[in-house]
Amino acid sequence: MTTNRVDPLEQTSPNTPTSKREKAKIYGKKLVDSAKIGAKTLSNAYKVTIGTIEVVGPGSDF
C-alpha cells in the first residue's frame, strides 16, 4: 500500500488559514511587525526632532 505524500503548502494556500490557531499566529505576527515598525518610526522621529526643538514664545516669527 503506497501513500502519496502531499506537501502541506499545496493543500491550502498561505493566504487562507483554516484553523483559528493559524489565523491567530498570522495576526499576532502582523501585530508584532506593526509594533516594531511603529516603535522604529517613533524612535527615528525622536532622533530627528531632538536636535531641532526650539522654544517659540509670544512675538516670535514663525
Swiss-Prot record:
It comes from the Bacteria. Residues 1-18 have a biased composition (Polar residues). Residues 1-24 are annotated as: Disordered. This is Uncharacterized protein RC0115.
